[in-house]
Curated annotation (Swiss-Prot):
This is Transcription antitermination protein NusB. GO terms for biological process: DNA-templated transcription termination; transcription antitermination. The gene is nusB. Coiled coil: none annotated. It holds the Pfam family NusB.
């Protein structure tokens, strides 16, 4: 079965989440450990997301810090929320043919699956704020 982009994003989330615990782990090994899929070959878009988020992580984290309310730091965020924000911000800025609204909607779908309703509202607000900043600068 071929994976669609939504499923690839879910698996990219899982790989990135696992790599937070062991940044030296091999992406292929982590990918193969994800349950519920028969694919052994990593989809190219998953590699784009995982490698892109890792490559730009410092910049993405700075941007996330800028989106937080005063008194909050990135260290206070739930780990799933942090991974979802990194993925969304990466897609908004670097992924080809992914409109901002799609990246935000996909982030909200990931939040429904991997986080909480409260987090969904937070992520929606943070990404909405980022989108507004981008639109104001263009």
């Amino acid at each position: 079965m071929s994976l669609n982009r939504h499923m690839i994003r879910e698996e990219a989330f899982q790989v990135l989440f696992a790599l937070q615990s062991d940044s030296e782990a091999d992406i292929q090994t982590v990918y193969e450990a994800i349950p519920h899929h028969d694919e052994k070959q990593i989809p190219p878009y998953l590699l784009t997301l995982v490698n892109g988020v890792r490559e730009h992580q410092d910049q993405l984290d700075e941007q996330i810090n800028d989106l937080l309310a005063s008194g909050w730091t990135i260290n206070r965020l739930a780990k799933p929320d942090l991974v979802i924000l990194r993925l969304a911000l990466f897609e908004i800025q670097y992924a080809e043919n992914v409109p901002t609204v799609v990246a935000i909607n996909e982030a909200l779908e990931l939040t429904k699956t991997f986080s909480s309703d409260k987090s969904r509202k937070f992520i929606n607000g943070a990404l909405g704020k980022f989108e507004k900043q981008v639109n104001e600068n263009n």
